[in-house]
């Protein structure tokens, strides 16, 4: 008779499909991370982006090491995070498609630190300060050197599908700018 693994107090390897299923329950925003190297623009749809701290302003971005965008960032040492609006799912699909002519018919501002998508909801221009390998991906730690936000709602990603964010009308919690603490409404 087989013993229950929980009774043995031994962690079993997690199945890749189950891991992806569980992590897929975490909703995230959708970004296109862009970079340029030797005058060639690169870009990829990335949801593994998070703020790290505000003093100095820093972010973490995780990219698959097989992506051309990954190689461009490693060489250029800077990139732009383009935060997509709720009406930009087709743009996210384009930049997620291998081999696609990603920048065709896309308004782009070519900047010193790489391309910035003109129609993005918001953007953060970043300078890499550190990076480390994490399995198939590389984690870039970067300082934000420029940022701007427009108006509108973000594109969201949840359980393998794009969607949009709908705030609660009578939210019980909000963040105050005075103390940056979450407090009751």
From Swiss-Prot:
Keyword match Secreted: no
SMART domains xrefs: Flavin_Reduct
Recorded catalytic activity of this chain's protein: 4-nitrophenol + NADH + O2 + H(+) = 4-nitrocatechol + NAD(+) + H2O; 4-nitrocatechol + NADPH + O2 = 2-hydroxy-1,4-benzoquinone + nitrite + NADP(+) + H2O; 4-nitrocatechol + NADH + O2 = 2-hydroxy-1,4-benzoquinone + nitrite + NAD(+) + H2O
Top EC group: oxidoreductase
Activity-regulation annotation: Inhibited by methimazole.
TM spans (from-to): none
Single Gene Ontology BP annotation: catabolic process
Molecular-function annotations in GO: 4-nitrocatechol 4-monooxygenase activity; 4-nitrophenol 2-monooxygenase activity; FMN binding; riboflavin reductase (NADPH) activity
Pathway where it operates: Aromatic compound metabolism; Xenobiotic degradation
InterPro entries, per database record: Flavin_Rdtase-like_dom, NADH-dep_flavin_reductase, Split_barrel_FMN-bd
Keyword Oxidoreductase: yes
Keywords, alphabetical: Aromatic hydrocarbons catabolism, Monooxygenase, NAD, Oxidoreductase
Quaternary structure note: The 4-NP/4-NCA monooxygenase is composed of an oxygenase component NpcA and a reductase component NpcB.
PANTHER family: FLAVIN REDUCTASE, FLAVIN-DEPENDENT MONOOXYGENASE, REDUCTASE SUBUNIT HSAB
Function recorded in the entry: Involved in the degradation of para-nitrophenol (4-NP). Catalyzes both the initial hydroxylation of 4-NP to produce 4-nitrocatechol (4-NCA) and the subsequent oxidative release of the nitro group from 4-NCA to produce 2-hydroxy-1,4-benzoquinone. It can also use 4-nitroresorcinol as substrate with a rate of nitrite release similar to that observed with the two physiological substrates, 4-PN and 4-NCA.
Similarity remark: Belongs to the non-flavoprotein flavin reductase family.
Protein name: 4-nitrophenol 4-monooxygenase/4-nitrocatechol 2-monooxygenase, reductase component
Species name: Rhodococcus opacus
Protein's gene: npcB
